[in-house]
Amino acid sequence: MNPSRYRKRLRLAAIVLALVAGCGSSNPLGGGSASGDLKSIVVGSADFPESKIIAEIYAQALEANGFNVGRQFGIGSRETYVPAVRDHSIDLVPEYTGNLLQYFDPKTTVTTPDAVELALARALPGDLSILTPSPANDTDTVAVTEATARKWNLKTIGDLAAHSAEVKFGAPSEFQTRTEGLPGLKAKYGLDIKPDNFVSISDGGGPATVRALTDGTVTAADIFSTSPAIPQNKLVVLEDPKNNFLAANVVPLVSSQKKSD
């Protein structure tokens, strides 16, 4: 593909998705039409419900603005779909600013949304770019049931660390090795989850994770902060005063062709 046309297409996509970001929870699908001769753009997603929903919002918004959109949803974890963006198997995928920053810069110390966005833009390799982040901050959390919080008098993640030997922790398998996952929780709070007490659940804090938490299969779980399951099930989100989980605004990650004369 001609690099200049590719960059032009991504710039047009950026305009559309910036409008989506600005819409918040309102309907982003109304609007005009982009140039009718645009080639296809492929939208991907991670393999959990929220990522698929956001990717579909992106896809429909782009279609409403004249793009021919291909969909490759449920690709897998960040370790799988980031390389797919880089090799142009997909053109864009919904991401989270803080998580993506920790993926490229595990030693980052920034925590606020603006600082995270700036640091992420600097940390990305040259063939990747981010578009306009949404105002929505949907960070990871450590959640427990109300009964567990009451039993152990839990307020913070540090409080849970005192019961490490008794905690069964539910999260996607990659949470065992990611900076913000078990390594970060151990380093910052002393929460030491042994391998036998980690329960791999692949739905990214979705229904299977919530069910495992509420039926006692796990004691604590990684659940996104905006999940409606938190109030619906009276789950308790433990405070994270040491900012293990960074601000995580939803943002489109796109491939950007290397500049070519």
What are these regions (language model features)?
Residues 2-13:
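Bacterial N-terminal signal peptides that target proteins for export
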Residues 77-78, 88-100, 115-117, 145, ...:
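Beta->alpha turn/N-cap motifs
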Residues 18-22:
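C-terminal motif of bacterial Sec signal peptides marking the signal peptidase cleavage site
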Residues 113, 132-141, 240-249:
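Short Pro/Gly-enriched coil loops immediately N-terminal to beta-strands
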Residues 38-70, 75, 135-209, 215:
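Bilobed "Venus flytrap"/periplasmic-binding protein-like clamshell domains
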Residues 104-131, 217, 228-242:
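Ligand-binding "clamshell"
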Residues 140-150, 248-260:
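A bilobed periplasmic-binding-protein/Venus flytrap-type ligand-binding module shared by bacterial periplasmic
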Residues 24-27:
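Bacterial signal peptide processing site
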